[in-house]
Amino acid sequence: MSHGETRLTDCRIPASNIIGKEGKGFILAQERLGPGRIHHCMRWIGICERAVGLMCVRASSRELRPNKFLSEKQTIQNWISESAAAIYGARLMVLDCAKKIEVHSTKGARKEISMIKFHVADVLMKVLDRAIQVHGALGMTDHTPLSFWYRHERGSRIYDGADEVHKSVVARSILRDQLD
C-alpha cells in the first residue's frame, strides 16, 4: 500500500534539524496539504481515465449475442459519457484550484482545495463502480486493476480529511461570503 506508519518514541531532534519555528509544525504542514491534495486529485483523475478505457474495451468486446455488443446498450453509453464528463469537470476544477494556489496561496484557495478533495474522490468512486459493473464478475477479480483500485482508493474519501469535513469547510465559506 502507499501509506505507511512510523512511530517515534523518545526521539530527540537537534535544533539544527528543525524545519520552521518550534511549535508551528501544524501550520507548516497545512501549507503543504493543498498541493498534496492537488497531487492526489490528479492521480485519481488518471485512475478514472484508465478505468474508462477498460470500461470501453470491455463494453466493445463483450458479446451479448452474435454481433450484439454491450457497448450498444444505452445505459452503458450513458455510463461512459457521464464518466467522461465528470472527469473533464474534475480536471478543470483541479486546474483552477492549482491556479488559485499559485496566485493567492494555499490559504487563499482553502475552499477550492476542499471542493476538489471531496468532488474528485466522489468522481473516482463513481467511475470505478461503473467500470466494475460493466466488467461484471470479472471486475471483482484481480484479473483487472479495477477491484484493487476500488479497495485501495476507497480511502480517498477518508484520508486527508473526510468528505464531510471538507464539505463543512466549503459550506462555512459560502455562508460567510453570502452573509457579508
State what each model feature region is.
Residues 2:
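Gly/Pro-rich active-site capping loops and adjacent beta-alpha segments
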Residues 17-22:
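Cytochrome P450 core scaffold surrounding the K-helix E-X-X-R motif
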Residues 5-11, 24, 30-180:
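Alpha-helical interface subdomain recognition
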